[in-house]
């Protein structure tokens, strides 16, 4: 190991809160074991999980041993939110989600080699623990006034209250840290910015139960320059890591549209580019922002990371093809559909009129027949990147991409997909 991992995280701005940083820096002079946990509260991880997850990868690359924990037990409870109780999901649903996110988690760290990662599920030691054992061995060490002082608990008590189930969540997570320390000598937990209270609970429980000194780090909460929560798509939903839930094209577009004020910070937090590379991109943003070099690099790195180089090449080709800089017929149907689905897709049923005028109106690119005719006469109407000059033009079978798709474009930038039934 050369640069200490703590120094690396510091210049990247990845340390939000921590226990004694000097002690942790000293501990990481030798290989340590650390963990981060992920509860299966949905069928997929989302973009917001990436910063803590990539912390494990950073530590592994620095010569440390990561443990990835899937919360098969804690996912049955749910970490308390600021507002309202979580919906209780069935055991079968949580088990299925735990399996799905375990597959996703395994893509981001290396499970072979000298510092091979481990994948564990806290259901292994939690599900068979009796209530009496839990209360005596774990609950005994948690003063009620400390638990009530937690910010989330205080906010809930001021509004609609909190159930004993969710109130106990921090004890379950604290016990995970103790178990991982006993089993694997794990001495560090990393987590998201909202996990500090839970992490400190685990640090305290290790000290009380085992007399062990362990450590904790949280990463910053990722927001954009306007304070909006990171990772929400243009439609308002989460950016999922599962390509069936968020297409690689939508994923790529989210990052390529990052604001100048955000892009360098995102590159520091989400990629493994060196300080020198990031400094060069920061100069590009400051001096030539119109080129959007940093945004293109961010989108490429993030899509490679989550979906692989082949998917990245496909979405970059799609982005070029939509604006006439590549051949639309070279796109596979899945990528084509994802790219045109950024806007509402018009469907033309059998027997419905399908002249270029009708298609422009149906697609929403124009709002009247007169506007459609003006667009055509001014040379601004395109189908599959071919200019259309006749008002009565209709598509033939050979025009349909993958037998059913047309890509309409008005001018240089406005496009829409049409599906011919």
From Swiss-Prot:
Q: Where does motif 'KMSKS' region map? A: 229-233
CDD domains, alphabetized:
S4, TyrRS_core
Q: Which GO terms describe its biological process?
A: tyrosyl-tRNA aminoacylation
Per UniProt, the keywords (alphabetical) are: Aminoacyl-tRNA synthetase, ATP-binding, Cytoplasm, Ligase, Nucleotide-binding, Protein biosynthesis, RNA-binding
| Catalytic reactions of this protein | tRNA(Tyr) + L-tyrosine + ATP = L-tyrosyl-tRNA(Tyr) + AMP + diphosphate + H(+)
Q: Name one GO cellular component term.
A: cytosol
Q: Quote the InterPro entries the UniProt record gives.
A: aa-tRNA-synth_I_CS, aa-tRNA-synth_Ic, Rossmann-like_a/b/a_fold, S4_RNA-bd, S4_RNA-bd_sf, SYY-like_C, Tyr-tRNA-ligase, Tyr-tRNA-ligase_bac-type
The UniProt entry lists the main location of this chain as: cytoplasm
User: Which residue numbers does the motif 'HIGH' region cover?
Assistant: 40-49
Enzyme Commission number = 6.1.1.1
Q: Cite the GO molecular-function annotations of the record.
A: ATP binding; RNA binding; tyrosine-tRNA ligase activity
Summarizing the function annotation, the protein's role is: Catalyzes the attachment of tyrosine to tRNA(Tyr) in a two-step reaction: tyrosine is first activated by ATP to form Tyr-AMP and then transferred to the acceptor end of tRNA(Tyr).
NCBIfam families under this entry? tyrS
- Describe the subunit structure: Homodimer.
Annotated protein name in UniProt: Tyrosine--tRNA ligase
**Organism annotation:** Corynebacterium efficiens (strain DSM 44549 / YS-314 / AJ 12310 / JCM 11189 / NBRC 100395)
